[in-house]
């Protein structure tokens, strides 16, 4: 901090105060909802990033930690197994859905994720359509829950068969809250 303030003649406290409110879209991004649960969008798209965010959120002692996620197609299958195992171990409920399936079948990807989940005692449901999965999470939320929509983060598209379709989780959440979904 001192190096930055020295060159730019900015007070250290100004930098500290700014860092306290700095936010990065899609990284532990809290989406306001008019209910007594917490809804978070995060870009966690591999086991390590998922583990980091879930272990951190677990420290808040939620009623339940619910993780909705999928895995990208045309990527190493081991990532799917690892993500399933990580979510199964750290979440009270995993909601398995689609992500950027690219040129792979969504259900094949989901089956690979389930292989990882099977290594744990974790509860899970499969909701193949991501919009429906978000609605499922919100409809089944209980007071004190933390819901993590993992994998998309800042992305506002879904890639399927070489085409990027507009899909912004923030817009989907707003539609659900407004009764449009």
Where are each of the predicted segments found?
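ATP-dependent carboxylate-amine ligase
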Residues: 2-181
């Amino acid at each position: 901090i001192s190096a930055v303030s020295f060159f730019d003649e900015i007070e250290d406290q100004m930098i500290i105060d700014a860092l306290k409110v700095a936010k990065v879209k899609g990284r532990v991004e809290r989406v306001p909802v008019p209910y007594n649960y917490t809804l978070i969008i995060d870009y966690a798209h591999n086991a390590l990033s998922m583990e980091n965010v879930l272990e951190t959120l677990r420290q808040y002692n939620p009623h339940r930690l619910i993780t909705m996620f999928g895995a990208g197609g045309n990527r190493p299958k081991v990532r799917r197994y690892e993500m399933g195992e990580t979510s199964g171990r750290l979440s009270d409920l995993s909601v398995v859905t689609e992500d950027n399936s690219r040129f792979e079948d969504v259900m094949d990807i989901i089956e690979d994720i389930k292989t990882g989940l099977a290594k744990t005692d974790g509860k899970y449901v499969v909701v193949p359509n991501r919009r429906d999965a978000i609605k499922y999470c919100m409809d089944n939320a209980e007071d004190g829950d933390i819901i993590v929509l993992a994998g998309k983060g800042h992305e506002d598209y879904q890639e399927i068969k070489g085409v990027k379709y507009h899909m912004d989780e923030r817009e989907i959440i707003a539609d659900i809250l407004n009764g449009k979904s």
